[in-house]
């Protein structure tokens, strides 16, 4: 069990997802590390910890990349971070329950870059849909699939 760990890119992670992760860490006695540039409220637990990094662009992301191992799972909505995690042989799951994979990450990066270019040229592209109960359930289901293998 000690080889497995869950990292959370916690600054933008929705609170309902953190709650699911807190329960999973306790249930499976699995290390859960939340990395953020601000203090994150966590329950008292020998399995749950947080790392507060300095302010700055992608500082939390770099911390996770520097410490992740192939048996780890990273929770992030940050597609470039997910790509780096996959390169290191670990798994990345977004808060809506979608697993980033070698097969889909390039397409996601391309779409992200395209949308960024559109926004940069003044086109209003809108944002993602509001986080929903269905997203929460999809995340819980995807996390459970990973936990079964642990």
UniProtKB/Swiss-Prot annotation:
Family the entry assigns: Belongs to the UPF0178 family.
Family matches, as InterPro entries: UPF0178 (IPR003791)
Protein's organism: Shewanella baltica (strain OS223)
A Pfam family it matches: DUF188
Protein name: UPF0178 protein Sbal223_2514
HAMAP family assigned: UPF0178
CDD domains recorded: PIN_YqxD-like
């Amino acid at each position: 069990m000690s080889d497995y760990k869950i990292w959370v890119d916690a600054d933008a992670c929705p609170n309902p997802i953190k709650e699911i992760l807190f329960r999973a860490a306790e249930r499976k006695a699995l290390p859960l590390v939340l990395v953020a540039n601000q203090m994150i409220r966590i329950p008292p637990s020998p399995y749950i910890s947080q790392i507060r990094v300095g302010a700055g662009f992608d500082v939390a992301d770099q911390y996770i990349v520097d410490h992740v191992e192939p048996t780890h799972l990273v929770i992030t909505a940050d597609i470039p971070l997910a790509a780096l995690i996959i390169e290191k042989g670990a798994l990345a799951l977004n808060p809506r329950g979608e697993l980033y994979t070698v097969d889909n990450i390039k397409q996601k990066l391309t779409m992200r870059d395209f949308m960024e270019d559109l926004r940069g040229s003044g086109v209003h592209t809108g944002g993602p849909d509001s986080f929903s109960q269905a997203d929460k359930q999809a995340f819980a289901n995807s996390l459970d699939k990973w936990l079964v293998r642990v």
